[in-house]
């Protein structure tokens, strides 16, 4: 390829890349939406597949697009910043982001407290309410949240709770319990098949797993939880202050 041909190819690639960015910015292709196939884009922009492929690869590398094997290429959802030191429920989190929230309960049942009795400081022969929900931010799945709530401390919580209600508000209004602190640990977890289904991601895709113990105003454990979120959908921040 001559220098002139290489220059011409670079101009075409840069033009196609910018047009794709413009279409995304103008809402032609929205977050989570699949873009046209390479063949369709070749026809639309009247360029070669090599040019289209390079433009798409660059936008994938920049985090603008994401390739899903066997499905196609999609517009990447904007990352959400989640401050690790924030102690609030999901509803409050959505308000802080200026976004709407929604939840879908995928599992709720009474189970043995034995695996959680030490963390919750409750008898091993008691029961906890297991609540598993998919949490949506602006209609996009963001988290899978599994919580275990001690029924010995919060009787009939499973009967009081209804889908869509804030668990933290229920703690405060029904049991005079305010969640004021928590302890979190974070690791990376490969998405299982059910998690991939609910989070609309690839099987084995990296997820943040945030394990938490929440404490009330008297420093008693309120609940334990595990939150799973796509690593490419959220930015975790840690604020440290020297005392």
Swiss-Prot record:
Residues 38-57 bind DNA. Pfam families: GntR, UTRA. GO terms for biological process: negative regulation of DNA-templated transcription. It comes from the Bacteria. Residues 10-78 form the HTH gntR-type domain. Gene3D superfamilies: Chorismate lyase-like, Winged helix-like DNA-binding domain superfamily/Winged helix DNA-binding domain. GO terms for molecular function: DNA binding; DNA-binding transcription factor activity. The keyword Repressor applies. Pathway: Carbohydrate metabolism; fructoselysine degradation [regulation]. Disulfide bonds: none annotated. Keywords: DNA-binding, Repressor, Transcription, Transcription regulation. Coiled coil: none annotated. May regulate the transcription of the frlABCDR operon, involved in the utilization of fructoselysine and psicoselysine. This is Probable fructoselysine utilization operon transcriptional repressor.
